[in-house]
């Protein structure tokens, strides 16, 4: 699938990398499944770059429009997960 990640040009290269790694983890949750602990760690790092809820929501909406993958739905599943790995249903 060809699409671009919603990135802020004001972020440093390191910050962009952190955001992309989180969004790639969301992709893996849909495509292959992902370890819940790994995803939580990626989310914590993402929140260091994007602490504001409004910006987080905007990035999530833009990413879902581009990819079809919902970061919000994945994180809701992770929050309530009782297993060590999750895989989203298409």
Swiss-Prot record:
Read off the InterPro entries from this record: BH2638-like_sf, UPF0223
Q: Fetch the Gene3D superfamilies from UniProt.
A: BH2638-like (1.10.220.80)
Which residues belong to the signal peptide in this entry? none
Pfam families, alphabetized: UPF0223
**SUPFAM superfamilies of this UniProt entry?**
BH2638-like (SSF158504)
Which family does the entry's similarity section mention? Belongs to the UPF0223 family.
HAMAP family given in the database record:
UPF0223
Quote the protein name from its UniProt record.
Answer: UPF0223 protein lmo1058
Organism ancestry:
Bacteria, Bacillati, Bacillota, Bacilli, Bacillales
